Each structure stands twice: as structure tokens, then as C-alpha cells.
Amino acid sequence: MKYFEFTFHTSPCTETVNDVLAAVLGEAGFESFVESEGGLTAYIQQALCDENTIKNAITEFPLPDTEITYTYVEAEDKDWNEEWEKNFFQPIVIDNRCVIHSTFHKDVPQATYDIVINPQMAFGTGHHETTSLIIGELLDNELKDKSLLDMGCGTSILAILARMRGARPCIAIDIDEWCVRNSIENIELNHVDDIAVSQGDASSLVGKGPFDIIIANINRNILLNDMKQYVACMHPGSELYMSGFYVDDIPFIRREAEKNGLTFVHHKEKNRWAAVKFTY
């Protein structure tokens, strides 16, 4: 297959901007992404490339005061998903208890929980601070026989770990069709059951739950907007873990959560990224 290589320059160039840009571009047909100096490099099949769609995605970019420009060239004839996986996705060990790797990795470190994923983008692999923060929470808390919702599941790495630790039943939801397909593949790779994957946003939560545990690793604006729907799926004693934002954003998250009846428990941080825990 023939691909285009797009180079996107973002201002400000932050991890949050690049994360959201990758999600937006994924909906526009892009398959693989590599963070680069000044922005993001992304690959899309030439047959699927619609420049009007790309321009509209940039025009409607959800983060205000962000400038995005791009150039593109015809990429060399190679499998860019495979290229990214082999050159940029390396095994990662979290808290000395959980190792995340792909099927092609050799000499993988041993850990209590061994998760195999075949991602096709640089998010949801465990390398990003927000993912590793939530993984740490899942490792530190009792999950056995607790129902769990993974909202904005991405690769479903969090739901897979939760299921390995005894959570059941588990539901994983993402708005992106690619994430749903990749989640199903990763769940099969890890031979876990009782994880139902579906496509949707917070509006799809109507009639679901209540859940003992909800995890949502998305971004600040979506979390603030969808908090009420999360709380509607909780019962007294339910736990809500959220990440995808910076430490400076915690007051905004906490204010909205407490307005909806949640109690702040704690926060953890890594390289300015934060994860918070609330109970209902």
C-alpha cells in the first residue's frame, strides 16, 4: 500500500496537544503516529487521504489557541505500522509488577502481570505518563469481582490488566472505531474473557452500570463535560479514577467532581501529568 507522510507542526507543542491531535487524525483515517520535534509525524494510506477532511479536523481542533500547520510527502513503500512498532514501541515494566510488550519482542522481562498488545499508534502502550499512573492505581487497589468501566479505552490495556487482577464484568468503550477493533484484538491476544467492547461516548452510558470502578484516561475538557454521566453510573462506595490532564488542572477536575457528589481521595503525578481518585 502507498502512504503519505504528514508532518504536523503544533504551537504550543505539548504532549496534550499532540495526544489530542493524534486522536483527531485517527478519526480522519491516519494509522500510525510518531512524536517529533515541534509536533507529530503521521501516516495515512493514499487511497484514504482526503485533504478537506484533514483541513476540517484542524479547523475544528478542540483545544483553543492552538496553531497547526502541516506538510506532506509520499512515504517510502513500507509497512509504517510495523515500522513504528519495531522502532518506537519497546517493552515497559511498571512498578516492577506489570510488563507490557508486543508479540515481536524478545527477551521480555518477567513480571506478575504480562500484557501483550499490538498497538498501531503511540498511545495506550503504557509509555505515556497518564497510562502508567492509572496502571499503578489498578495494581495498588483491590479489584477482585468488582465491575469495571474503562471509558476511552484506547488499546484496552487498562481493562485487560483489571480483568487479570480479577475485576468482572468489564466494559471498555471508545468513540474511535479503530480503538474498538484494536481492543478486541488485544483482548484475544491476552486470553481474557468478560470484557465487552463497544463504540460510543458518554451518551452511550445511559442504562449501564452501576459500576464498582470507573477509569477514564481521556483529557480535561472531556472529563469535565462527561463527569455527570460517570456519576450516574456509580453507587455509594464506587471509585472513579481519572487521568489525561496536568497537575495544574486538578482544581478544575476536583471542583466538578465534588459538585456532582464525589469525594476526593488522592492524586498522583508523574512529569506534571496527574491521576486522581474519587469515591461516591
UniProtKB/Swiss-Prot annotation:
GO terms for cellular component: cytoplasm. It catalyses: L-lysyl-[protein] + 3 S-adenosyl-L-methionine = N(6),N(6),N(6)-trimethyl-L-lysyl-[protein] + 3 S-adenosyl-L-homocysteine + 3 H(+). Its EC number is 2.1.1.-. CDD domains: AdoMet_MTases. It is an enzyme of class 2 (transferase). This is Ribosomal protein L11 methyltransferase. It is found in: Cytoplasm. One of its GO terms (molecular function) is protein-lysine N-methyltransferase activity. Keywords: Cytoplasm, Methyltransferase, S-adenosyl-L-methionine, Transferase. It comes from Bacteroides thetaiotaomicron (strain ATCC 29148 / DSM 2079 / JCM 5827 / CCUG 10774 / NCTC 10582 / VPI-5482 / E50).
